[in-house]
């Protein structure tokens, strides 16, 4: 199950999410300058997130024995090569993306988290959800950024599912503090990611000027995915 909603009408959704056999990816595109400012890239942030996410799903599933950090480094290199002749990839505002991905492996569910999107493990034995995120640099045009990602393996014992969420979706708990993490997981597992995003939007609609929750973006792109394992 997955859902995504742009934060600004009339502006492309810069989140990207997709899934394939035994794997899923979620990216949150970003840049360091305001919209419409020069980034050195003629394609834009939404294109970069989509291109990198598509490439990562392909590399992660084509070579299941390759660690996810290696799959990400390969995907970054592929996307770099797609536009290095048309865009200035040394520009300080070149498009970037947070990255999360999970893949089924014999030992459990392998995960990778780069920057501030989240991977959440949902256990069915009473344990609270395990939240995995990383605050290092985002992916840009340098494959070595993959080495900064948090990676590991979630054991399958007692695991009901895993969730991927962009920071626009986790605002409901991180910024607004309206739901604790266990309730976030319950909502997306039992009612779907779209329900969670609607709750985020309802909170934002109730604070249109950012007085209750001061924030740089009144609404951000919000994306969530839940992968049922049992």
Model-identified regions with their sequence ranges:
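PP2C/PPM-type serine/threonine phosphatase catalytic domain
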Residues: 1-230
């Amino acid at each position: 199950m997955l859902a995504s909603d742009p934060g600004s009408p009339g502006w492309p959704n810069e989140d990207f999410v997709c899934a394939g056999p035994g794997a899923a990816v979620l990216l949150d595109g970003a840049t360091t300058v305001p919209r419409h400012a020069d980034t050195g890239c003629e394609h834009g942030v939404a294109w970069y997130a989509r291109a990198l996410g598509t490439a990562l799903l392909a590399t992660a599933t084509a070579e299941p024995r390759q660690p996810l950090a290696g799959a990400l480094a390969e995907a970054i290199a592929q996307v770099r090569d797609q536009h290095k002749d048309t865009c200035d990839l040394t520009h300080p505002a070149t498009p970037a993306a947070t990255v999360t991905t999970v893949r089924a492996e014999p030992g459990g569910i392998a995960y990778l988290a780069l920057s501030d999107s989240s991977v959440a493990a949902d256990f069915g034995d009473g344990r609270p959800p395990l939240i995995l995120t990383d605050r290092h640099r985002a992916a840009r045009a340098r494959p070595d950024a993959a080495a900064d990602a948090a990676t590991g393996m979630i054991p399958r014992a007692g695991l009901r599912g895993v969730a991927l969420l962009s920071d626009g979706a986790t605002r409901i708990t991180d910024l607004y503090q309206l739901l604790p993490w266990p309730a976030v997981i319950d909502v997306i597992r039992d009612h779907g990611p779209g329900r969670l995003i609607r709750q985020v939007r309802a909170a934002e609609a109730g604070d249109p000027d950012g007085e209750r929750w001061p924030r740089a973006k009144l609404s951000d792109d919000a994306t969530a995915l839940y992968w049922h394992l049992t």
